[in-house]
Amino acid sequence: MKYDNLLDRFIKYVKVNTRSDPDSETTPSTESQEAFALTILKPEMEAIGLQDVHYNPVNGYLIGTLPANNPTLTRKIGFIAHMDTADFNAENVNPQIIDNYQGGDITLGSSNYKLDPKAFPNLNNYIGQTLITTDGTTLLGADDKSGIAEIMTAIEFLTSQPQIEHCDIKVAFGPDEEIGVGADKFEVADFEVDFAYTMDGGPLGELQYETFSAAALEVTFLGRNVHPGTAKDQMINALELAIDFHEKLPAKERPEYTDGYQGFYHLTGLTGTVEEARASYIIRDFEEASFEARKVKVENIAQSMNAHLGTKRVLVELNDQYYNMKKVIEKDMTAIELAKEVMEELAIKPVIEPIRGGTDGSKISFMGIPTPNIFAGGENMHGRFEFVSLQTMERAIDVIIGLVCKA
């Protein structure tokens, strides 16, 4: 089905810079996210018929309700999307609209960049469709403003067609998903549903209830700096310690060598001097045992190095970030079975694969609300080559409507 306001709504959203800030200590991490919620989304939610629309300044969530119009549809279903965009330029987003894409290269604005099917073969899945791309200078923000636009448009459609019967619906738009803290302060009591869906997936058909389990690792290396001319048997180079530590991790267990259910260690930052160095890693795996084994391994490497050095010069700080939500959702697969049924009725093939990442649903599931993830359409997310198909977004709306009418 086509939805008249979808494209304009999406374009309006992506033009607002809501990039999150990993170094911020506030919630939301950037003022622009709160402004987006209060000045754009909240009035629009009220205008399309959502009730009890309210913003929580403590956790940055904007929530609204659409009560059921059929008392026999007793389930309560939630839909969640995040307002922030990833760590890439999001200022002056200038989307391009490619009608009836016929294949071949897409030049991104006046930049020297292009979407080339040889580099991005996923373009071949969208022949004949309307694509929204960047101009090559920013990301697009389909992750996750496509999800916001889809939820909004679905609600607008339902309130404009009161003869369509649906269950109770809760909507939540939250901050800071991209920096991993968006759901930390989520209040379950303010979102009373049986289960929910994040509209935060990628291509058509994605239905996901397995995520990584995730940990952040910070390793500090303490050296001893002396004049290099007299350094023999005295200098301890912290940078060399960092290199030694990194080389003790399995070389093939890095993101660029892994896929499917394989976990990894990912070095995300390395700074320092001879005197002191610091390495930042993320650790990811799907199975609980292998996730724990990865954390034990880095602890053991540090202990071994310290024993060899004769003193504690390698300091490890490990913090769990989120866990594989499969552990929660597989206890009651209702949300998955319902979504599969709706997709199949819409002639959409469910693509059930693990998310090599996390969603807000990872944390919210462990808070007591099973929250799998549904496709929102974005491709090549988090950079200048991001694009989305208007037709895939329309199909996501079809799924939302199907879910609440079948509940």
From Swiss-Prot:
Zn(2+) 2 binds at residues 143, 178, 382. GO terms for cellular component: cytosol. Keywords: Aminopeptidase, Cytoplasm, Hydrolase, Metal-binding, Metalloprotease, Protease, Zinc. The active site is at 84, 177 (proton acceptor). Zn(2+) 1 binds at residues 82, 143, 200. Its cofactor is Zn(2+). Its EC number is 3.4.11.4. It comes from the Bacteria. It catalyses: Release of the N-terminal residue from a tripeptide. It is an enzyme of class 3 (hydrolase). It is found in: Cytoplasm. Binds 2 Zn(2+) ions per subunit. One of its GO terms (molecular function) is metallopeptidase activity. Its main location: cytoplasm. GO terms for biological process: peptide catabolic process; proteolysis. Belongs to the peptidase M20B family. Cleaves the N-terminal amino acid of tripeptides. PANTHER family: PEPTIDASE T (PTHR42994:SF1). This is Peptidase T. It comes from Streptococcus pyogenes serotype M3 (strain ATCC BAA-595 / MGAS315). The gene is pepT.
